[in-house]
Amino acid sequence: MFEARNSAVPVAGTLKIDYQPDRLRLTRPNDKEGSPEMKRTSPTRRDLLATAAAATAVSMAEVAPAAAQAGPKPIFPVPMVTIPIVGESQVFQVRRIYCIGRNYAAHAIERGSDPNREPPFFFQKPTDAIQNVAVGEVADHPYPSLTKNYHHEVELVAALKSGGTNIPADKALDHVYGYALGLDMTRRDLQNGMAAEKKPWEIGKSFDHAAVLGPIHPASKTGHFEKGAISLAINGTVKQSSDLSKMIWSVAEQIAKLSEAFELKAGDIIYSGTPENVGPVVKGDVLLCKLEGLPDMSIKIV
């Protein structure tokens, strides 16, 4: 069944279906109201079959959108997590957050690991752990629950526009959309406690606001970051200071290694590791993060 509408649809190149609310009429293209041709018009079997086919097509066209709308719907909406892009009205939708651990030799040593080129390890944070910080803003960052030893870790973050599996390192940067400055905030006492018990330490890394992030800068404008000064200061005193060239695994190598274990996709972001001298923050501290080639990022612990 279909509902008649006020419309005219060509049929088989010779007839026209004229839909009216109270009737369905066939006419030929050159027929005029009241003309002899119109009075003599008598639909043939071919005309009637074409009419039925057209009516079915109209019916299906009207029913399809309704059927789609009638499909399963979420019981409640879940907000989409996005990151602003500098110079763009569009935003970057986040799919997953990957983080690499101990990717600077000096930081590996201070965390009790071998600084040699051992295989990298990764962990994840929930996408809704992101706290966006605008350029020029000093954003309030809440001191989290359960910890008495809250640490800063400043990092370069890569944002992917595409992905795949087993990506060669020499092709990996082709998948990078852009870069941002980030903070991997850590409840160090909880992380260390779980590590001592040989248990997963998500509670120390994966919590609300744990992924602080500046806006994304397209790589088409900044180029790729393989070297450059990176630092963090607390209340004007520099605490972390290093260079991206001191990474054990480059961003390209991280992407290649990750793609061996996971299918990477557009929307994935990668925290590329922090240099040495991570340390605690307390309420009232103002953190200033710097990365050569990107605007500064700042938060206040509240």
Cite the ranges covered by each PLM segment.
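Short, structured patches in soluble enzyme cores that scaffold and shape functional sites
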Residues: 125, 156, 160-162, 180-185, ...
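Secretory targeting signals
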Residues: 1-4, 11-43
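Hydrophobic, well-structured mid-protein blocks that either form specific transmembrane helices
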Residues: 166-200
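A generic structural signal for short beta-strands and their flanking turns/coil linkers
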Residues: 117-119, 126, 152-156, 175-181, ...
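Catalytic-pocket segment enriched in acidic/His residues
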Residues: 70-91, 107, 135-137, 188-302
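Extended, compositionally biased flexible segments
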Residues: 70-171
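N-terminal secretory signal peptides and thylakoid transit peptides that target proteins
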Residues: 38-55
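C-terminal segment of classical bacterial N-terminal signal peptides
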Residues: 58-65
